[in-house]
């Protein structure tokens, strides 16, 4: 029998970065209960995990319309993923394109594991929606960020758990400039500023210098994309129109 008792709630995969923080705000606008889920998998930029509580606290303090909706936070030790991965996200190696054409920041199976574990927690918590910041538009080559992957995973999870989860990916067709715009639509300039200062994107974990677009080394692919997106957002352009 298909489970139908899930409440109007969402579990958001929340790393502490720009995209997932925007997804938390997006869910808070749409659901009565929002819980968050983070993973420690041995990532080089582990500082992002330290940003999570600051973002959650700031959302509660600065956005009273959301404070009563933001529920429990869950943190999962997924160090086994780092142990079996040989990538620039989990090793101090140079970021480059691998022989298969994928960036060596790709962690095989990461989003599949994240969503599957998220579904198990959501099932226990009685939450209907799983929300993730996967995106095809700012395409880095990650196959587990594709819309087709998420749709297939939704089918598999619902069959395997005999329920009716909805996998929400609000950023799927947005570029980084659009993601900044979405933050402004959700919470105005205060939310944009919260995300700019409190979230973390840099792959190498640099958090000593605050740029116009946020903290970071300014040189890794994640920093460059965040910078281009923020500058395009300020100009009212898309990332594809922005100079490289």
From Swiss-Prot:
Reactions catalysed: 7-carboxy-7-deazaguanine + NH4(+) + ATP = 7-cyano-7-deazaguanine + ADP + phosphate + H2O + H(+)
Cofactor requirement: Zn(2+)
GO annotation (BP), single: queuosine biosynthetic process
What CDD domains does the annotation carry? QueC-like
- Where along this sequence does the record place binding of ATP? 14-24
Pfam families on file: QueC
* Protein name, as recorded: 7-cyano-7-deazaguanine synthase
What gene, per UniProt, encodes this protein?
queC
